[in-house]
From Swiss-Prot:
Expressed in many tissues. Predominant expression in testis and pituitary. The gene is IFT122. Changing residue 7 to C: In CED1; perturbed ciliary protein trafficking; no effect on interaction with ITF43:WDR35; fail to assemble IFT-A complex at the cilia base; no effect on ciliogenesis. This is Intraflagellar transport protein 122 homolog. One of its GO terms (biological process) is protein localization to cilium. Coiled coil: none annotated. It is found in: Cell projection, Cilium; Cytoplasm, Cytoskeleton, Cilium basal body. The keyword Iron-sulfur does not apply.
Length: 1241
């Protein structure tokens, strides 16, 4: 840093205070009793302002630039406009010591010896507050919320906008350390910078990629570049990056200068940050730069010093002849103004020089004057090293980093050999003050440049070697070498260029030119030397011959490519110039200085930052390609070119028959197609092919240069390849030129290819015609089939010979797919493929044609009826499916289908369907029972399934009643059903049937109908069962309420036995039979009332046909005096009507038979003779005409006037009116689902 005096002036009186206009164009000085207004650009006094009667002590400008204020010993404050006009004046009781504008609200604080006042343009009066001591200085926080007051008694008082004290800070010196100047830091992102600094020495630095500070205790300690993000700043941000306002409100830092000759820093809360810093003089003024990065401090030492924001002294801005009472930095610039006791006004420009070092991809530079940032140009990683002292010089080489501080040199090393490692640690310290122009570091040495002299020092500070030059040294660069024996390239002002080895006392003169050296670089192989002289000319020499190879103008820096011997770049005049070998220079716009060139990356320094610019090497590559230097062009391309450039290189090399280079280039762009071509050419070369025309023809054909390829094919004697190429390309007009002399195979091939082309370009009809003419019927059929051209398909099928089975079969397949079964059948018949014809009928469900074909060819019976049966089953036509299964002889499959349907219905609680399927199963078993071998087994299953069908049919109503919110059945019906189920359930309850639901329904309906005894019995039974939660409450309530009912059942509900006229109890232990005569009750399949029917049996020897014929005879009723006879034996008791010659009378023999009282506990069936049968009326008899092997069942109605209907299919009994209603509702029998119009069995 150095300060340049811009202008200076001298006033008659002491300069007490200074204020800049916010835009920096004007400067307001408090001198004597006047205000002096200066133009900052040239120091011209614009206007003196008069208004005060005594010395003006202070002046302040509002942030909006509209007003400024001045305070004087005359106890008054004057408000001035930016047009230098006074607009307001108010007074205090004492002299005004300081004034300050709120940066946000523009409220003015004015402080005197005894009080301070707050004024704003919106207020008419000034609010004043008393002070315990004389106020010397004041300052607002960045957000304008708090005002800090510095007092003569050493106290700092922090007040809010209303003047109320919030924080009080007492300095150790008390009244012996008056607070002479205070200032809030405009930047607030550095608070954590101070947190761990109290016990740190200057040389113990903190290295952290993310600017997190960790104390260092040992010289050999390792500092990691990994860490958490710090609060004050990001590693990549510079000081001029945007601030976070919210963070600023929390972390305002107050700098305090007192006459205890100390500088200290405080947080807004009053907590001190770090230790006090001794000054050794009385400070009179302290102020920050606009962005808070530096502090200006002046006082009794008669100079202004520049400090870092943490209080580290950096240097002197300007020395004066008297005390410095005020100093300020011009807003947003590096200009500083100083006001002195003797009236001197000095205006300085601060110039911050760039201190940096570069080695390959590592760049180190100074930041904030006391920090060093090392940047990895490839990975963009950064690490900050905090030195806490002014950084004077930086040098970097391989894993070494040297930093020169005012009193020492620190040498760092990388922790590991990893190329991307950013872990630095202190290796050595040279505690000695050095003055040098340039600093260079090697593996084990430090090189100092002092004008004409070079000194080589070890890391311990011992001078090992010294070189004295003839002229001033202008440039030094380490060019590498073994550790301890590195070579240096030195350029002198007299044009001499030398090479010096660290371990050699003698310098080697490489060459000497007429002009002074500005920049140097040596090529990777050390055979060429590039020099930039003071005339901005880049000169390139051959080191061995000292010959000037070429020179280029407009250069200020130069760098050789570290990966390519013949490439260099230089910058100048706002352009970047890239030169390859002796080719012309390629130029592009670029600001800055070239400092390195590695592959395709050019490192450019612009102002204070360095950046890696990715520069495609396309231009030099094409220069090599123009001269057919493919291998050299490939080397250039490896440095970095676009994919398009790689492809161009590959194509050029391929046409130049440089297959090796072309192969490498195509690998780069991953073009497998061309790689296969090159591979095939290499294989052919290995087999001895040497015809380059043929190779080049293949290349041209791949590149799309077909006519050139055809000419080369023809020239090389391979016309067939040209024909094949044009055919594949569908360029048939050109292909005909290469046809042989009427070769039918080639002609057919050409037509086929043309048809393929027509097919691909969506001309299918033309393609079909071409395929037919070429004899490719299969392909023609495929096109017709894909486009649904049925007419063309059948036309082709009819023209084909029946021996051509493959195209005919394909035709039939497409016709079937296109829903033209008639044409498909015609094709199958032409082929004689009857099995496929049967399959066609089955798949298209043309059952009539299939059955007709099956009649003619019985061998296809299974192929027809099995699919038919499955189709019927899928369409819920189970009766027909069963017949089909039977017809196919697949009884087991029929039973399996029904069993599966039944199980599914039970599992899904579809009990009505389950009953229907069980009935069908029973009828299936009855049909199978006709086989004598399976008769007994099947009859057992028949009765079992019949019983299950009856149970599930009844339980369906119970289930719906308990699950649905509304019931469609009358209470009497639900009562009868639940009684029927309770008496009928076997010991093992069938799957899906719930005893709880049956008993719950029985209890509920019994209670409703007056059968209280039966209801109590049902509730008692329920207590022994597991009750679902949803029934629990109802059952508990019913159990309690039934106790209040009488313990008997209503007589109206008691069932009557129509054989013996006995009243049976509602709860019958014997089941659904009479307790007296054991006659089974016959129930209605809808209401489950006991029907007035009695089953009777035929005497032995009477066949079913004879019985029917006897019943159909209409005879007179027998007379009342006919006798009834009883024949008894030891084994059984049989009631028989004896036929005598006088037996015909008025009394009905059957009725008389039923009224006979029998004894014993065994059931005695009613057996009738021919006479009794003859006496019966056909209207009173119901017959269940079971198919064999079962016998028919006969039932006699005892109340002929009450009509009963029996379903002719399932033989279930109904009240006639119930049956008719149900058939009207459902259109079929509710039990077996036989439709009304279906014929009987």
């Amino acid at each position: 840093m150095r300060a340049v005096l811009t202008w200076r002036d001298k006033a008659e009186h002491c300069i007490n205070d200074i204020a800049f206009k916010p835009d920096g164009t004007q400067l307001i000085l408090a001198a004597g009793s006047r205000l002096l207004v200066y133009d900052t650009s040239d120091g011209t006094l614009l206007q003196p302002l008069k208004g005060h009667k005594d010395t003006v002590y202070c002046v302040a400008y509002a942030k909006d630039g509209k007003r400024f204020a001045s305070g004087s010993a005359d106890k008054s404050v004057i408000i001035w406009t930016s047009k230098l006009e006074g607009i307001l004046k108010y007074t205090h009781n004492d002299a005004i010591q300081c004034v300050s504008y709120n940066p946000i609200t523009h409220q003015l604080a004015s402080c005197s010896s005894s009080d301070f006042g707050l004024w704003s343009p919106e207020q008419k009066s000034v609010s004043k507050h008393k002070s315990s001591s004389k106020i010397i200085c004041c300052s607002w926080t960045n957000d304008g919320q708090y005002l800090a007051l510095g007092m003569f008694n050493g106290i700092i008082s922090i007040r809010n906008k209303n003047g109320e004290e919030k924080v009080k800070i007492e300095r150790p010196g008390g009244s012996l350390s008056p607070i002479w100047s205070i200032c809030w830091n405009p930047s607030s992102r550095w608070e954590s910078f101070w947190m761990n600094r109290e016990n740190e020495d200057a040389e113990d630095v903190i290295v952290n990629r993310y600017i997190q500070e960790i104390p260092s205790t040992l010289k050999s300690a390792v500092y990691s570049s990994q860490g958490s993000e710090a609060e004050e700043e990001e590693p990549e941000e510079e000081d001029d990056s945007p601030r976070d306002d919210n963070l600023e409100e929390r972390n305002d830092i107050l700098a305090v200068a007192d006459w205890g000759q100390k500088v200290s820093f405080y947080q807004l809360s009053g907590k001190q940050i770090g230790k006090d810093r001794a000054l050794n003089f009385d400070p009179c003024c302290i102020s920050y730069f606009t962005k808070g990065e530096y502090i200006l401090l002046g006082g009794s030492d008669k100079q202004v010093s520049l400090f870092t924001k943490d209080g580290v002294r950096l240097g002197t801005v300007g020395e004066q002849n008297s005390w410095v009472w005020t100093c300020q930095a011009k807003p947003d610039s590096n200009y500083v103004v100083v006001g002195c006791q003797d009236g001197t006004i000095s205006f300085y420009q601060l110039i911050f020089s760039t201190v940096h070092g570069l080695y390959k991809d590592r760049y180190a530079y100074r930041d904030s004057m006391t920090d060093v940032i090392v940047q990895h140009l490839i990975t963009e990683q950064k690490v900050r090293i905090k030195c806490k002292e002014l950084v004077k010089k930086i040098a970097i080489y391989r894993n070494r980093l040297a930093i020169q501080l005012p009193e020492k040199i620190l040498i760092y090393e990388l922790y590991s050999e990893d190329l991307s490692d950013m872990h630095y640690r202190v290796k050595e310290k040279i505690i000695k003050k050095f003055e040098c122009n340039l600093l260079v570091v090697c593996a084990n040495h430090i090189i100092l440049c002092q004008e004409k002299r070079l000194q080589c020092l070890s890391f311990s500070g011992v001078k090992e070697r010294e070189w004295q030059m003839e002229s001033l040294i202008r440039y030094i660069k380490v060019i590498g070498g073994p550790p301890g024996r590195e070579g240096l390239l030195v350029g002198l002002k007299n044009g001499q260029i030398l090479k010096i080895f660290v371990d050699n006392l003698f310098a080697i003169v490489l060459l000497k030119q007429a002009t002074a050296v500005r920049c140097l670089d040596m090529s990777a192989s050390r055979k060429k030397l590039a020099v930039v002289d003071e005339n901005d000319t880049c000169l390139v020499y051959d080191i061995d011959t000292k010959e000037l190879l070429f020179q280029e103008p407009n250069a200020n820096s130069v760098a050789w490519n570290t990966q390519c011997e013949d490439m260099l770049c230089f910058s100048g005049g706002g352009y970047l110039n890239i030169k390859a070998s002796t080719f012309p220079v390629h130029r592009q716009k670029l600001q800055g200085f070239v400092v390195g060139y590695n592959g395709s990356k050019i490192f450019c320094l612009h102002v204070f930052s360095i950046s890696a610019v990715e520069v495609p090497q396309s231009a030099p590559m094409y220069q090599y390609l123009d001269r057919k230097l493919f291998k050299e062009a490939y080397q250039i391309a490896c440095l970095g070119v676009t994919d398009t450039d790689w492809r161009e290189l590959a194509m050029e090399a391929l046409e130049g028959l440089d297959f090796e280079t072309a192969k490498k280039a195509f690998i780069r762009v991953q073009d497998l197609r061309y790689l296969e071509l090159i591979s095939s050419i290499e294989e052919r070369k290995k087999r001895g092919e040497t015809n380059n025309d043929l190779f080049l023809a293949d290349v041209f054909s791949y590149q799309g240069k077909f006519h050139e390829a055809a000419k080369l094919y023809k020239r090389s004697g391979h016309e067939n390849l040209a024909l094949e190429m044009y055919t594949d390309l569908c360029m048939f007009e050109y292909a005909k030129d290469f046809l042989g002399s009427g070769d039918p195979k080639e002609t057919k091939m050409l037509i086929t290819k043309q048809a393929d082309w027509a097919r691909n370009i969506k001309e299918p009809k033309a393609a079909v015609e071409m395929y037919i003419s070429a004899g490719e019927h299969v392909k023609a059929i495929e096109i017709c089939g894909d486009h649904g051209w049925v007419d063309m398909l059948i036309d082709i099928a009819r023209k084909l010979d029946k021996a051509e089975r493959e195209p005919l079969l394909l035709c039939a397949t497409y016709l079937k797919k296109l829903d033209s079964p008639g044409y498909a059948a015609e094709t199958y018949l032409k082929m004689g493929d009857l099995k496929s014809l049967v399959q066609l009928h089955v798949e298209t469900q043309r059952w009539d044609e299939a059955f007709a074909l099956g009649e003619k060819h019985p061998e296809f019976k299974d192929d027809i009826y099995m699919p038919y049966a499955q189709w019927l089953a899928e369409n819920d036509r189970f009766e027909e499916a069963q017949k089909a299964f039977h017809k196919a002889g697949r009884q087991r499959e029929a039973v399996q289908v029904l069993e599966q349907l039944t199980n599914n219905a039970v599992a899904e609680s579809r009990f009505n369907d389950a009953a229907y399927y069980y009935w069908m199963l029973s009828m299936q078993c009855l049909d199978i029972a006709q086989d004598p071998a399976q008769k007994d087994t099947m009859l057992g299953k028949f009765y079992h399934f019949q019983r299950l069908a009856e149970l599930y049919h009844g339980y369906h109503a119970i289930h719906r009643h308990t699950e649905d919110p509304f019931s469609v059945h009358r209470p009497e019906t639900l009562f009868n059903i639940s009684r029927f189920l309770l008496h009928s359930l076997p010991k093992d309850t069938p799957s899906g049937i719930s005893k709880v639901k049956i008993l719950f329904t029985l209890a509920k309906q019994s209670k409703a109908l007056g059968a209280y005894r039966l209801a109590r019995h049902a509730y008692d039974k329920l207590r022994g069962l597991y009750i679902p939660a949803r029934f629990q409450k109802s059952i508990e309530l019913g159990t309690l309420t039934i106790r209040a009912k009488p313990f008997h059942d209503s007589e109206e509900l008691v069932p009557l036995c129509y054989r013996c006229s006995t009243n049976n109890p509602l709860l019958n232990n014997l089941g659904n039979v009479c307790i007296n005569c054991r006659q089974p009750f016959i129930f209605s399949a809808s209401s489950y009332d006991v029907l007035h029917l009695v089953e009777f049996y035929l005497e032995e020897g009477i066949t079913d046909e004879e019985a029917i014929s006897l019943i159909d005879l209409e005879v007179l009723r027998p007379k009342r005096d006919d006798r009834q006879l009883e024949i008894a034996n030891n084994s059984s008791q049989i009631l028989r009507l004896v036929e005598t010659k006088d037996s015909i009378g008025d009394e009905d023999p059957f009725t008389a038979k039923l009224s006979f009282e029998q004894g014993g506990s065994e059931f005695v069936p009613v057996v009738v003779s021919r006479l009794v049968l003859r006496s019966m009326s056909r209207r009173d008899v119901l017959i269940k005409r079971w198919p064999p092997p079962l016998r028919w069942q006969y039932f006699r109605s005892l109340l002929p006037d009450a009509s009963i209907t029996m379903c002719p299919s399932c033989f279930q009994m109904f009240h006639s009116e119930d049956y008719e209603l149900l058939v009207l509702q459902h259109g079929c029998c509710p039990y077996c689902r036989r439709c009304k119009d279906d014929p009987g069995p």
